[in-house]
């Protein structure tokens, strides 16, 4: 029997965030997530989906002839077969990224994958789910992301940046304002005032298409 994954959608669009923001990318959105962040913009991926073989997923990805592939969710690592999918995507020559909540062990993920680890802030309502052991595994190919809901979240993220030396461990540290919760101009001003070694990140796809699935 072939390995399978439960998939919500596979689509081709522009990457809205991370270091490849603005670049055409194929997104493979896996179904299911053990977290319930209060600002989640992909709750439609919590359940449902279609059970598909890895071969069928790879075939669809190849049909777009992409350079970049992003495996996202939900929480992709909640499905064990995400690990072989990531490896096979790398073997096929794509530049692969993984968007993960940071609540699950990333050690088995192929080192060629850029792991985008989302450290949950107090404002997410899931801060207790952070797996800080993952920080020791970060390399220059990886990225750490904070979604910030308030000044309190910002101060918390700065404390973690300093405590763990995140800018020395990961290739990028990304600060994003939670949509409709934190004013992006305020966040920009705070980053400049504190001279932080982080990248301000806005979700390009929301500016272009709001929260339309498949975009």
Give residue ranges: language-model regions:
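A secondary-structure boundary/capping signal
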Residues: 29, 72-73, 203
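Short linear functional motifs in flexible/disordered or boundary regions
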Residues: 19, 40, 49-52, 69, ...
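Conserved AdoMet/S-adenosylmethionine-binding subsite of the radical SAM
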Residues: 78-215
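Generic structural signal for well-ordered alpha-helical scaffold segments
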Residues: 15, 58-62, 162
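N-terminal [4Fe-4S]-dependent radical SAM core
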Residues: 1-49, 64, 206, 210-215
């Amino acid at each position: 029997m072939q390995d399978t994954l439960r998939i919500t959608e596979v689509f081709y669009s522009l990457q809205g965030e991370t270091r490849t923001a603005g670049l055409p990318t194929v997104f493979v959105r896996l179904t299911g997530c053990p977290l319930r962040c209060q600002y989640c913009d992909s709750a439609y991926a919590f359940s449902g989906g279609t059970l598909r073989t890895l071969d069928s997923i790879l075939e669809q990805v190849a049909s777009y002839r992409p350079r970049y592939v992003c495996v996202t969710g939900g929480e992709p690592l909640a499905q064990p077969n995400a690990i072989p999918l990531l490896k096979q995507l790398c073997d096929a020559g794509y530049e692969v990224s993984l968007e993960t909540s940071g609540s699950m062990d990333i050690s088995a993920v192929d080192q060629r994958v850029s792991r985008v680890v989302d450290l949950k802030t107090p404002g997410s309502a899931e801060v207790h789910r952070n797996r800080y052991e993952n920080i020791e595994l970060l390399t220059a190919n990886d990225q750490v992301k904070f979604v910030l809901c308030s000044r309190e979240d910002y101060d918390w993220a700065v404390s973690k940046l300093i405590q763990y030396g995140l800018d020395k461990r990961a290739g990028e540290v990304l600060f994003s304002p939670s949509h409709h919760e934190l004013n992006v101009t305020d966040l920009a001003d705070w980053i400049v005032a504190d001279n932080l070694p982080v990248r301000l990140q806005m979700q390009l796809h929301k500016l272009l298409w709001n929260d339309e699935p498949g975009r």
